[in-house]
Amino acid sequence: MARVTVEDCIDKVENRFELVLLAGHRARLLSSGAPLTVDRDRDKNPVVALREIADETITPDDLKEQLIHSLQKYVEVDEPEPEAVPLLSSSPAAAAVAPQAASGDDNDIQFDRMSEEDLLRGLENLAPPTETEDEGD
């Protein structure tokens, strides 16, 4: 009985392996309560699934999409474009405006920006710490 049904389905789905995947997925849907599109005739769910594919009451493309969706673990989410996200600017004008746009706390601290070269020159001009008696022993 199932062999005849498989032969009928080969016209709709050329690949037998894909047919097995689709029919198995449809059989699981039927066992979980999906409505039948053909009469059961005392057949089991895999045979009913093959008959549905053979009679074209459900399309293989729809089954394939449902199968792919059921196997997906992560759903792709569209994220905003990188240009849409405002970039922080390191210009002095932007640094002067940023604290004014902040919450307005009286304790806001503003830091001066300096280049890496200025920072290195400042570190070179620092005197090394003097040794104390505790460090010498």
From Swiss-Prot:
Gene: rpoZ
InterPro entries according to UniProt: DNA-dir_RNA_pol_omega, Pol_omega/Rpo6/RPB6, RPB6/omega-like_sf
Basic and acidic residues: compositionally biased ranges: 110-121
GO cellular component terms, A-Z: DNA-directed RNA polymerase complex
Species this chain originates from: Methylobacterium sp. (strain 4-46)
Protein known as: DNA-directed RNA polymerase subunit omega
One BP annotation, GO: DNA-templated transcription
Region (Disordered): 78-137
Task of the protein: Promotes RNA polymerase assembly. Latches the N- and C-terminal regions of the beta' subunit thereby facilitating its interaction with the beta and alpha subunits.
MF term (GO), any: DNA binding
Family indicated by similarity: Belongs to the RNA polymerase subunit omega family.
Assembly with partners or alone: The RNAP catalytic core consists of 2 alpha, 1 beta, 1 beta' and 1 omega subunit. When a sigma factor is associated with the core the holoenzyme is formed, which can initiate transcription.
Catalysed reactions, as listed in the record: RNA(n) + a ribonucleoside 5'-triphosphate = RNA(n+1) + diphosphate
EC identifiers of the protein: 2.7.7.6
Entry keyword set: DNA-directed RNA polymerase, Nucleotidyltransferase, Transcription, Transferase
PANTHER family tied to this protein: DNA-DIRECTED RNA POLYMERASE SUBUNIT OMEGA
Biased composition (Low complexity): 84-103
